[in-house]
Amino acid sequence: MHNESTEHRIAELESRLAFQETTIEDLNAAITKHELELAKMREQLKIMVEKIKASQPSMIASQAEETPPPHY
């Protein structure tokens, strides 16, 4: 009877281990996918920021547009 109990416990542990290994593989795949998506989003954000900066005129006038100070 003790032998059956031990065998049952070992079988239960093996089953749990197999489930945990599958879960870890699934989580690893999800993290890898998310990392790729995040890298793409970062690149898209960088491009969008560059486009916004390029489309907005500067609030600082160029040297040629500036009027000389009054003491000149």
Curated annotation (Swiss-Prot):
Fetch the HAMAP family from UniProt: SlyX
The stretch of residues making up the signal peptide is: none
One Pfam assignment: SlyX
- How is this protein named in the record? Protein SlyX
Instruction: Tell me its family.
Output: Belongs to the SlyX family.
Q: Which domain of life is it from?
A: Bacteria
Protein encoded by which gene: slyX
